[in-house]
């Protein structure tokens, strides 16, 4: 991209505003080196990245980029063995914390369902160096001082220093408080000179205290003397301070070496947070100028909706719709000077430069922009004093350069094309130049005040006229771009408003050809039609926005309704589960009582005790279960139930054996030690046991109950497996098994953990352990039952 183009389109001013939104010198460095890209894929990714950061700002308001500094030179010095200062190490720790904090911030948003695929990829590159970070902050305080707790040795040395200082001060203060000292001292204070404690002694008493003179006052009347009695103490203090300095240097070298070990990771993290600072600066700038993400296409057309110049106050500037590249490839904006034509030209150019830099642009949603390999701009009066070139010559030098380089991947912007010379020749040159650039396939926006170019827009298929609206009532431009309508001078209307007589104006009209008058009238009608069409469009757009608002409100209400419904269902489900859980606990207690009855002696179990236990067990079923319909899967006409068949009683989820049919719809069923009547509709056929030698059986089933000593869960889904474990343990308890095995396999460990978590809470489990070598090892859990 030509440097001149960036300058005349004020690209650097946009960068200056962008700099204000960076959080660190790292981000500022990225902004300073920012230039527009010409790679389509890169531009799309940059726009998507800025959009993700803008989403974060919309949801969170900001991003935690504080505390990050440019530590790259410090880290490189650490790599070559230089000792870093406490503040330099603290900057490294703070930057490590900042990068770790930013990583956690983005990952938390992603975990909460916010889609940030690009930013997630960025923070995934950040490697946490928490241990090194804590080592530094444990050794260095917020003020940059090495703290006592940095090492036991340093703590001991500083204790010695404080003790020595206390003893010295105590001796000196005793000396200054004595009655004789008042006349010998200039002041009753203890001070420090050359890092040694001294007292201010009058010149004539210098020999009283002995010791060492370290300094004197400006008048020479006071000497700062270290009395002989504290010389040894001061010497000991100095020795301790030397040891302190050596220990601090050792600690700093140790920390520096640890930074050097992790230098590559630290530098990599710094590069990531520098990019994040840069990305979020673009997002904050987009918020500031009310910019949006454009749709980037590679089909060489743009559709800027309600485009604004980013450097002009959005409350002041008039937004415009600018289309180029589909129905026409060249826009010629005609009309008088000071009408806003140049602002429109610059708006097109700066929006393209910003979009190709990954910046959002000040337009409405759904605006589109294409990628140009080159952008050429001939804007403004840039006379070359050194080359003694006129305005026309200066422009022509630029135009010659443009004509040499422009092609079908170029955007060309001409301001006042052909100006600065004879109007007739200038208009002819402008037409030829436009033809040349258009024939090369470039996209062109040109401004001119030559009326000859109005006809140009009608005579060329890919060219369209445009103008900036002028309000004759206020005698000022409205800055509204009218595409398809050439500009008018409005000289007669302006003159009339300013008081020129109708007679003079009518005479002036007579000097203009009939064709010219017709053209002016036609243009006036076009302007009126354009205004009406735009008014209709604005009304339609307002209705569309209102419809979208209503649609969003309806969606919100639907979401709230669904959330409330789900919340109520969840609450009802939770209440149901609580009732079922309470029923299970009660049933377990009853089963335990029945087991105790059986252990007593089968002959001692009275009928009324069984009837009472049966009633209590049935009463333990929660209302939700009692009321729900039972889905019978097995009682098809082909399967006739017979005495001895094994069935599942659906109400209790327990296996039982049919004893005898007591009515057309009921059977007497043996469930563990209970015998009860159950309707066929409440049974599920399991199988018919093989005929074995019949034994005399009491009304209680013994250890020939059909429950396996092990439960194999391999291949089961987690939820199904947990349901089977629950049922199996109940069956095993009814069968009075002291020990059972649950085979869950090794796998990922999820099923094993789930089984053991359940066993911890089961009231019927005494203990459990992993299987021994011969029992299946970690793939099996052996359960001891109560």
Swiss-Prot record:
BP terms from Gene Ontology: mismatch repair; negative regulation of DNA recombination; rescue of stalled ribosome
Ranges of residues in domain Smr: 711-786
SMART domains assigned: MUTSac, MUTSd, SMR
PROSITE patterns: DNA_MISMATCH_REPAIR_2, SMR
Chain sites annotated for binding ATP: 335-342
EC number: 3.1.-.-, 3.6.4.-
InterPro entries the record matches: DNA_mismatch_repair_MutS_C, DNA_mismatch_repair_MutS_core, DNA_mismatch_repair_MutS_sf, MSSS, MutS, MutS2, P-loop_NTPase, Smr_dom
Signal peptide residue numbers: none
SUPFAM superfamilies, A to Z: DNA repair protein MutS, domain III, P-loop containing nucleoside triphosphate hydrolases, SMR domain-like
Transmembrane regions listed in the UniProt entry: none
PANTHER family with a match to the protein in the record: OS10G0509000 PROTEIN, OS10G0509000 PROTEIN-RELATED
HAMAP family in UniProt: MutS2
Subunit relationships: Homodimer. Binds to stalled ribosomes, contacting rRNA.
Function of the molecule: Endonuclease that is involved in the suppression of homologous recombination and thus may have a key role in the control of bacterial genetic diversity.
NCBIfam families, sorted: mutS2
Protein name: Endonuclease MutS2
Organism: Bacillus cereus (strain AH820)
UniProt lineage: Bacteria, Bacillati, Bacillota, Bacilli, Bacillales
